[in-house]
Design a protein with these regions (language model features):
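Structural detector of well-ordered beta-strand residues that form the stable sheet scaffold
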Residues: 38-40, 75, 110, 133, ...
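Extracellular glycoside hydrolase catalytic/binding regions
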Residues: 91, 105-111, 128-136
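Aromatic-lined carbohydrate-recognition surfaces of secreted/lumenal glycan-active proteins
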Residues: 36, 105-120
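Substrate-binding cleft of extracellular glycoside hydrolase catalytic domains
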Residues: 1-105
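Functionally critical loop-and-helix segments that line ligand-binding/catalytic clefts
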Residues: 1-2, 123-162
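Residue-level detector of flexible, active-site-proximal loop/helix-junction positions
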Residues: 46, 82, 116, 139-141, ...
Length: 162
């Protein structure tokens, strides 16, 4: 395993119960075999301003906890919630809000989404430009020439101690 990507906060804004302990453990073990720690936040917004504020609040909280420097990349987890999917316009607004908050905090930004979102909801301008972490639970990734994901999540069954 070369790295880990950790959930930062819950919908309430509270830290995930294992987040700080996991970040501390990872930070003390980064070496040539285990090189990075990314953070992700599931979006609960549908417009630019709310997305910007949600991301900025999360990143500020992480900074105050003293672990923002451990963040290799901050990922927006963009999936349907509240009983419906995003529209392309909503997805673009949320991506823009999160991306601008990450840039202001000096943290590289990435996008986590499933293949359906990448193909049908996310504007190609984003999927081609952003560091992409794709979920596709299959034995093969399929044709990804257009958007070239950097990370492929093919299972949700793995675990790591801690």
């Amino acid at each position: 395993m070369k790295g880990a990507i950790l959930r930062t906060t819950l919908k309430s804004g509270a830290f995930d119960s294992k987040f700080l302990a996991n970040v501390t453990g990872i930070a003390s073990n980064i070496n040539e075999h285990f090189g990075y720690c990314g953070f992700y936040k599931f979006a609960y917004t549908r417009n630019y301003l709310d997305a910007y504020l949600e991301a900025m609040t999360t990143l500020t909280k992480i900074e105050k906890a003293g672990v923002l420097g451990c963040c290799h990349r901050f990922y927006l987890d963009l999936e349907g919630w509240g009983g419906r999917d995003y529209t392309t316009r909503e997805a673009s607004e949320v991506i823009k809000g999160y991306g601008e908050a990450a840039a202001e905090m000096g943290v590289p930004f990435g996008l986590y989404a499933n293949q359906n979102y990448i193909l049908h909801i996310i504007d190609p301008i984003w999927s081609k430009r952003l560091y992409l972490w794709m979920a596709r639970y299959s034995k093969t990734m399929g044709n990804t020439d257009e958007w070239e994901p950097k990370i492929w999540q093919y299972s949700s069954k793995g675990t790591v101690n801690g």
